[in-house]
Amino acid sequence: VWHAADPSQYPPMDVHGTLPWSVLDAASPRWRERVTWWRDHGVDDTSPRAHAQGMIATGRHGRISGGVSRFDPHLAEVCYRWFCPPGGHVLDPFAGGPVRGLVAGHLGMPYTGVDLSAAQTAANRARAADWELAGLSAGGTVWIDGDAADVLPRLDGRYDYLLTCPPYHNREKYSDDPRDLSAMRWGVFVDALRGIVAAAVDRVK
């Protein structure tokens, strides 16, 4: 958990009923209630990925999410509250949908996300603009189009916290772009992922 020099500045440990125990129960009523609040306010937008080439269309995941992975907004919320300084700048090299950016903006934390899909980043910016108009976000959410391997070394400054969700190799295939990790063979994927993670860590204070 992030610690301030002055204990009086420690962040709240109780985040809508979730406490920093060893096991987080995402099936608990309080957790589900908070996830519902976020999603009722439009925290996610999976439409740019809904027609990607290879989604998980079978089993429970295919039934509840149309085969598109969705980042848990309350998980993002507790991670930010517990591990990022108040107002800290978040870096996300595999941004995907808008969840982590919108949650950061709602909590008053600047956010910089990078994603290869221009359609997804455009959708994210549109959703963020809606949130700012509705008073749900303090702004400061930025999405950059491009390959994180190229973008990260060019970023200015340092970041306070790194939170991301890398591709699951070929479990979800987004495009045939040779820079797309989901289109790579396993060995190439691992090397590319390691390089991007190392570059992202290098940008953190």
Please provide the spans of the model-predicted regions.
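Conserved S-adenosyl-L-methionine
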Residues: 76-151, 200
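Pocket-edge positions in alpha/beta enzyme catalytic cores
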Residues: 64, 68, 113, 181-188
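Helix-to-beta-strand junctions that scaffold the AdoMet/dcAdoMet cofactor pocket
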Residues: 203-205
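Short amphipathic alpha-helix with an adjacent loop that forms part of the alpha/beta core around
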Residues: 151-157
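S-adenosyl-L-methionine
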Residues: 1-85
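Mobile active-site "lid"/loop adjacent to the S-adenosyl-L-methionine
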Residues: 158-199
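A short His-aromatic
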Residues: 55-58, 83, 154, 169-174, ...
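Short, well-ordered alpha-helical scaffold segments within catalytic/effector domains
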Residues: 72-77, 149, 190, 194-197
